[in-house]
Amino acid sequence: MQSPSLDPAKLTFRDAVEDDLPRCLALDASFQSDYVWQMTVNDGGDEIQVSCRRQRLPRQLVAQHPVDERQLLMALHMDNCFVVVEDPYSRQIVGYVTMRLDMSGRVAYLQDLVVDLLHRRRSLGARLVHVARVWASEFRLQQIIFEIPTTNYPAIRFAQAQGFTFCGFNDHHLANREIALFFSLSI
């Protein structure tokens, strides 16, 4: 379901400020999925095989993107990216992206890409990825790594559609101890 009054062409993309945090936390970051990615690792000494397989769920999963208020607060620092999408007329925030910078590896880690449920399917996510790429190129970074839980199949498909490619995983990377998949995008 979309909000009929929002004109995507007139939205403002700007750096977040601390006063934006409550509005960002209030966004509906939920998602629905009929699939998850199942990870299998076979460690055979001289060879490690990792298999990623799309698995259909017995019933639709409704879940929430894990948003950490402390992590958002840390994203406000100058060496991180925190950009919000705002309707300039209503002053309503409809989405945001956060990335943390790793200058030693010349990488940005995309941690949050949130578009409010009512405002999806309008290319706002793709526009936020573009903003993230511009930000990363200004810091002369080489790539963006997108961290996605295995249960967020819509985000995985979105990342792939934006040109991100699978580059690894971590069993207990996320705050809720869920498996994180990593997708990279060269700058």
Per-segment meaning from a language model:
Residues M1-K10, L25, Q32, R177-I187:
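Terminal substrate-recognition subdomain of acyl/acetyltransferases
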Residues A16, L113-V115, I148:
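Hydrophobic adenine-recognition pocket in adenosine-nucleotide-binding enzymes
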Residues D19-P22, G105, Y153-P154:
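Short alpha-helical
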Residues A26-Q111, D116-L117, H130-V131, W135, ...:
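Acetyl-CoA-dependent GNAT
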Residues V115, R121-V134, E138, R157-A161:
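Conserved acetyl-CoA-binding loop-helix of GNAT-fold acetyltransferases
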Residues A136-I148:
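Conserved GNAT acetyl-CoA-binding A-motif
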Residues E147-I148, Q160-L181:
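Conserved catalytic-core motifs of GNAT/GCN5-like acyltransferases
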